[in-house]
Regions:
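Conserved catalytic cores of very large enzyme subunits
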Residues: 2-218, 222
């Protein structure tokens, strides 16, 4: 009863009124992810740097004692399951080529901020743990690594690799940041990159990702 009441309260507040804590932020994230899937044909709609934009809510609630690490891990495990639930119909050839019905929802953990400081945090570790717990192909978990990555984080990522699930994918900041700068990004924007879909490094919030736009702008052959 209390759980459902809290869920109803969360849904009444977000995303319209903005999240006030980690639990509400998780609910808001899930609403937005579903809306984007529906609006944009549901392919490669990637959560990006989940551990970064969710961390302020986590930190605030942990300091006030509203949440525990165990509760946060449970919420993240649930989000991972829900992300794997999302699907879209494909023809047989596409299903075979994509090794199933993956939606390539890339979620990346670790890395550095715009000032070049490593920002691996508790949620970075919990992201890996969530994939360990649910053992599902979605979200497509990735990790950012560089010479400032904590050794413990590399070990934890390697433990997930050892399971054979094919996660996480590893992305080297030392190579990707200069490559993005060579394409016109500022150093600050390049440091804040995330991965879209399979392997595409892009800057959060500054890349147009509306992949089905031609469905609306191009004339239909049937017209």
């Amino acid at each position: 009863g209390d759980v459902y009441k809290r869920q109803a309260q969360n849904c009444a507040n977000v995303p319209e009124k903005g999240a006030t804590g980690f639990y509400e932020a998780c609910q808001s994230f899930w609403f937005v992810q579903q809306l984007l899937q529906i609006e944009s044909s549901g392919h490669s709609i990637s959560p990006g740097r989940f551990d970064q934009y969710m961390y302020p809510y986590y930190q605030k609630d942990m300091e006030s004692g509203k949440i525990t690490r165990e509760f946060v891990q449970e919420l993240m495990d649930c989000i991972w399951v829900k992300l794997n639930d999302l699907n879209k119909c494909r023809d047989a050839a596409s299903a075979e080529g994509f090794a199933g019905y993956s939606l390539f929802q890339n979620l990346i953990a670790g890395g550095q901020n715009e000032e070049g400081i490593d920002v691996t945090n508790d949620l970075s570790f919990m992201s890996i743990q969530a994939s360990m717990h649910v053992f599902l192909p979605q979200p497509s978990l990735s990790v950012r690594v560089w010479n400032g990555t904590p050794h413990e984080f590399l070990i934890r990522a390697a433990e997930l690799t050892r399971t054979g699930i094919g996660l996480p994918a590893y992305y080297n900041d030392e190579v990707i940041i200069p490559s993005l700068m060579s394409r016109g990004l500022t150093l600050q924007d390049a440091r804040d990159y995330n991965i879209i879909g399979c392997v595409e490094p892009q800057k959060s919030g500054k890349t147009e990702g509306w992949h089905d736009c031609l469905l609306y702008t191009s004339p239909s052959p049937r017209d």
